[in-house]
């Protein structure tokens, strides 16, 4: 049908239709970093010169706009949400099965939406999360005996929300709470009560699931999510016992364990979703009982914790990481994209974020996008630009 539709129109007509649709979105945000003589070269030549050390600020601006182009092309009202490949998948069997990865990938795809004038691209994300929550409610009830809805680290066209693949990567039951952050951000940019009513069931369901997953931690009497894991990272075990961090390499006979409780990212996500649900319910004048339930649980979540080496704790105890330089930095969610930790408001915790990044600063692949934003919030322009250049080459 698409081909027949296109065949009835001339090339100039199709081009103009494309421009009319695309340019209002693309032109909603401009960035000007200046130009050098390299800007006149073709892309391959410019990349070669950047690898050789040349400065090409215009290329960096284009790199920024390319990310916006991908979102414009990939996520529009009536389409599926942006996933790991989307319209550029050229094989019937793509990597990661062509699915959505929910423990950072889909979130990073939508980071430019609100701040660069692409708010309309989040409509397909809202539809996606609504579909996902219906499946997630069955998983929450059937797998955990919990209210609300859940999603783990990956899903597909059938909206699978159960733990899939391995516990190592799959045990991340609060990824629904992370997805909903994009809807909350859209509301913050457009504080419309009708929109808040649309997204409130998703906020509420995620909060209810979070409440039902809480258990009391015996030492400090904190409420922690159990079971869970820090996305795709794990601690070192020897003979079934966890090892505490002591600055030494892990033993040769250590194995990786992910399954635990009270991981930092869970605490951070629950703090956000509980706070947002309370605010939304108050604005809408509903769910007093739920607000009261959250009010009891929220103060008992664990605080942000700092390890003896000054880094931010990834787990509730200072376990020895199986891979100290792991590419994921899930425990830094509170600094970006959340703002629970800030340089001005919580400088000691922000310094712990900085020290964590010193260890976890491999900018390869998708992880570079997260680390660019972390360095930007730290005010480290030099390192931020170093990561950008690394990704460009």
Which residues make up each language-model segment?
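Beta-sheet entry/capping signal
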Residues: 61, 68-70, 221-224, 370
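Active-site core of glycosidic bond-cleaving carbohydrate-active enzymes
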Residues: 102-105, 113-138, 142, 158, ...
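Acidic/His metal-coordination segments adjacent to aromatic residues that form catalytic metal sites
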Residues: 86-97, 151-171, 228-262, 318, ...
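Acidic/polar, glycine-enriched structural segments that form the non-catalytic walls/loops
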Residues: 1-100, 118-123, 129-139, 282-286, ...
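Short, well-structured active-site flanking segments
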Residues: 76-85, 122-123, 190-197, 205, ...
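Acidic/histidine-rich catalytic neighborhood
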Residues: 205, 209-280
């Amino acid at each position: 049908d698409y081909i027949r539709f296109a065949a009835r129109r001339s090339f100039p007509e199709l081009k103009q239709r494309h421009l009319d649709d695309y340019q209002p979105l693309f032109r909603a945000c401009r960035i000007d970093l200046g130009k050098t003589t390299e800007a006149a070269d073709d892309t391959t030549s410019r990349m070669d010169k950047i690898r050789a050390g040349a400065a090409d600020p215009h290329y960096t601006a284009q790199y920024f706009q390319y990310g916006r182009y991908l979102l414009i092309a990939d996520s529009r009202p009536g389409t599926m949400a942006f996933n790991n490949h989307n319209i550029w998948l050229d094989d019937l069997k793509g990597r990661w099965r062509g699915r959505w990865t929910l423990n950072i990938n889909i979130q990073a795809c939508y980071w430019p939406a609100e701040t660069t004038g692409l708010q309309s691209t989040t409509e397909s994300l809202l539809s996606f999360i609504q579909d996902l929550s219906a499946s997630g409610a069955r998983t929450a009830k059937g797998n955990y005996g919990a209210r609300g809805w859940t999603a783990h680290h990956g899903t597909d066209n059938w909206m699978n929300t159960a733990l899939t693949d391995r516990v190592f990567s799959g045990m991340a039951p609060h990824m629904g709470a992370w997805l909903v952050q994009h809807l909350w951000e859209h509301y913050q940019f457009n504080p419309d009560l009708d929109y808040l009513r649309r997204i409130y069931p998703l906020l509420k369901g995620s909060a209810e699931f979070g409440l039902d997953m809480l258990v009391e931690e015996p030492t400090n009497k904190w409420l922690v999510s159990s079971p869970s894991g820090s996305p795709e990272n794990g601690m070192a075990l020897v003979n079934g016992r966890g090892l505490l961090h002591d600055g030494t390499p892990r033993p040769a006979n250590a194995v990786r364990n992910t399954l635990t409780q009270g991981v930092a990212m869970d605490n951070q996500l629950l703090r956000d979703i509980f706070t947002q649900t309370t605010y939304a319910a108050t604005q809408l004048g509903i769910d007093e009982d739920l607000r009261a339930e959250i009010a009891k649980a929220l103060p008992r979540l664990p605080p942000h914790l700092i390890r003896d080496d000054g880094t931010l704790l990834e787990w509730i105890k200072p376990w020895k990481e199986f891979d100290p330089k792991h590419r994921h930095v899930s425990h830094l969610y509170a600094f970006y994209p959340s703002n629970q930790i800030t340089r001005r408001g919580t400088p000691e915790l922000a310094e712990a974020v900085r020290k964590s990044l010193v260890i976890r600063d491999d900018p390869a692949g998708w992880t570079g996008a997260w680390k660019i934003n972390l360095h930007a919030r730290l005010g480290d322009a030099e390192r931020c630009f170093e990561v950008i250049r690394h990704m460009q080459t």
